[in-house]
Structures are given as structure tokens and as C-alpha cells.
From Swiss-Prot:
GO MF assignments: 4 iron, 4 sulfur cluster binding; lipoate synthase activity; metal ion binding
Full protein name: Lipoyl synthase
The encoding gene: lipA
PROSITE patterns registered for this protein in UniProt: RADICAL_SAM
Protein residues bound to [4Fe-4S] cluster 2: C87, C91, C94
SUPFAM superfamilies: Radical SAM enzymes
Length: 323
């Protein structure tokens, strides 16, 4: 997965997390063996890195030290982050910079579409920072990016990973009307953690957003992801699964939270691979079409391959229902 920011700020680098500067340092737990990966050295990785540098793009994968960077870049998987690199929220888990965002780049939709075509992407994920400063939360910009990709690379399937559009009436409806193939909105964590982990969001607003997508377009695939290791209890994770199934969400991803810096929320535990497998089994039993659950699972990890499996799972379900 290549997470690509849309611009390079030529100005002096801002303090990345000013809102966290006052927080005491927290202990960073040593990663267990099952989290560690080899350094990226493949030809495909080098080629992807060259493409990124050629287009003068910045990647969160590099800055955040994503554990999947070698695997994803080797396969030229890409996730574009639109609407700038500065977020209006300050979630305790996230390494994206917080502050006052810059104005939208009106050329960005076409530039993203050109990159998708030049990289030959069969599946692309479009995500963004939160833009609470915009009247529509960036919905129109999402719409324009989707349209531009459809025009430049018609065969590419499009997955969007959106913010929650909190207090932005009509924003969700506009994005759904643009017809992405997959609508992803991450719950991030269980309800009991929202005040400390995701204070700018509302748990049941996010559940309702995912439910509303299905009401607007029952054929659209919906997806959500969470992190574990933030102090949640198992029963809270199972309740979250039930809430997502009530919203008819198709695809659930579960991955291990990794602490970006000492100023971020600490890792409370490293969940074992066996526990991840158990979560996967339970999630399938609750009716999800697709489940990805492992320590290194990330929301856009294997997104293209998973989309193909997701479509196949739906077709199988429809055939079984027709018998």
C-alpha cells in the first residue's frame, strides 16, 4: 500500500503534533517477533519508490514506517491521500499532522487520475484527512477525484476511505452518488475508547454513516476497520461486530495498533495471531462477506485482491440464496 499525499509543502516543516506536545511520554512496548518484517529490497519496491519520487510525492508509508511497505510497494499498490497532509482532528492513535489545512488543490483530481493511469493500477484506494473546515467536509472533492479516475482509467476499481462527515448534511449522499466500488469508513476502535482514542468522532454516528450508505445504494460494498491493542475487551470487539452487521457492513479488517511516537496513545497489549484468527472466525459466523484479521492487517492492505474475493463472496451468497 502506497499512501501518497497530494502536495509537498516547500515551507519550513511544521511541528507535526502540536496538540500532543504537552502530553507526557508513554512507554513504547517492544514489538513481538510476529510484528517484525524484513527491510524492503525488491525490484518492485525500488520501481514504486522511483515512481513516487519522479512525481515528487510524499508517502505516509515512509514517514510512518509502515510494516507492510516492502510487500505493498513490491506489488505497486497505491492509496492516495487527498485534500492535503494536515488534518483538523487530533486522534490519539494517528500520525498524520494536525493543524490548519491549506486550501484545496483544484488540479488534484486530474493529477491523481493521471498517476493512477501511469502506474497501471487495477484497484485504487482514495483516502483523506478530516476537513472539518470545509462546508461539505470535502465531499465534492471526493466526487471530483472519483469522476477523474473513471475518465482517465475506466477499468480501475475505486475504493474510498472517508472521514465521518460529522455535521455535514448532504455530504455522504454526494459521495455515494459518485459510485465508488467500495465505501470504507473505519470505526478505528470500540465504543468505550472513543473519548480517549478518537475524541473528535462519535461511535454511533459512524455506525449510522455506514448504514446510510447501504440505504442509499444497497449494491455498494461497505467496509470498516478497527485496531486492537488499545485496551479493549474481547466482548467490546464482538459488540462492535454486531453493530457493523446491523448496519449491513460487508467487510471487516482488524489489525494491531502500533504506537507512532511516545506522545501517542500507548500500546496496551500485543494481540496474538491466535486471537486474531479467533476474531476472524467469529466475524464470519456473524455474517461478514470478508474478514481480514492479523497483526499486520491494515485497512488498505491487499485491497485489490480482497475486492476480487469480496465480489466472489457476494456472488456465491446470491447463488446459494437462489437455490
Amino acid at each position: 500500500m502506497v499512501t501518497i499525499l497530494d502536495t509537498i509543502n516547500p515551507d519550513a516543516k511544521r511541528v507535526r503534533h502540536p496538540e500532543k506536545a504537552h502530553r507526557p511520554d508513554t512507554e513504547v512496548m517492544r514489538k513481538p517477533d510476529w510484528i517484525r518484517v524484513k527491510a524492503p529490497t525488491s525490484k518492485g519496491y525500488a520501481e514504486t519508490r522511483a515512481i513516487v519520487k519522479e512525481h515528487k510525492l510524499v508517502t505516509v508509508c515512509e514517514e510512518a514506517g509502515c510494516p507492510n511497505i516492502g510487500e505493498c510497494w513490491d506489488k505497486k499498490h497505491a492509496t492516495f491521500m487527498i485534500m492535503g497532509e494536515i488534518c483538523t482532528r487530533a486522534c490519539a492513535f494517528c500520525n498524520v499532522a494536525t493543524g490548519k489545512p491549506n486550501a484545496l488543490d483544484m488540479d488534484e483530481p486530474e493529477n491523481v487520475a493521471k498517476a493512477v493511469r501511469e502506474m497501471g493500477l487495477s484497484h485504487v484506494v482514495i483516502t483523506s484527512v478530516d476537513r472539518d473546515d470545509l462546508e461539505d467536509g470535502g465531499a465534492e472533492h471526493f466526487e471530483k477525484v472519483i469522476w477523474a479516475i473513471r475518465s482517465a482509467s475506466p477499468a480501475t476499481t475505486i475504493e474510498i476511505l472517508t472521514p465521518d462527515f460529522l455535521k455535514k448534511p448532504g455530504a455522504l449522499e454526494r459521495v455515494v452518488a459518485a459510485k465508488p466500488d467500495v465505501f470504507n469508513h473505519n470505526m478505528e476502535t470500540v465504543a468505550g475508547n472513543y473519548l480517549t482514542v478518537r475524541p473528535g468522532a462519535r461511535y454511533f454516528h459512524s455506525i449510522r454513516l455506514l448504514q446510510r450508505v447501504k440505504e442509499l445504494d444497497p449494491t455498494m460494498f461497505t467496509k470498516s476497520g478497527i485496531m486492537v491493542g488499545l485496551g479493549e475487551e474481547r466482548n467490546e470487539v464482538l459488540q462492535l461486530m454486531d453493530d457493523l452487521r446491523t448496519a449491513d457492513v460487508d467487510f471487516l479488517t482488524i489489525g494491531q495498533y502500533l504506537q507512532p511516537t511516545r506522545k501517542h496513545h500507548k500500546v496496551e497489549s500485543f494481540v496474538t495471531p491466535e486471537e486474531f484468527k479467533s476474531y476472524e472466525t467469529v466475524a464470519y459466523s456473524k455474517g461478514f462477506l470478508m474478514v481480514a484479521s492479523s497483526p499486520l492487517t491494515r485497512s488498505s492492505h491487499h485491497a485489490g485482491d480482497d475486492f476480487a474475493r469480496l465480489r466472489a463472496a457476494r456472488e456465491k451468497k446470491l447463488l446459494m440464496a437462489a437455490e
